[in-house]
Amino acid sequence: MDKAEYEGAINRLVAAAELVVSGASDEQRLDALAMLAFFRLRRARIAEHGVPHISSEDLFTGTATAALTLAGRKELLAASALLDQARMLVDA
């Protein structure tokens, strides 16, 4: 995966996480904020570390798009599940 494609996917994931945080209940807010922090940190580290290993690049980019789409439709639980899936695809 090239840097531009990764950046685009991370930006979609950050946007989806921001939407999930804004609509999360009090019980879900902490998990949503943790997910947002994870993707913001990944975005900030692109310059230093480059693109990390992604176990399935096509699944990662598709998941990013789907998460943003569902978050935009206020399907917050589904978007959260997709954010979690994307997180698992990124090797730490």
Could you tell me what each predicted segment is?
Residues 1-92:
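Long, charged/polar, soluble alpha-helical segments
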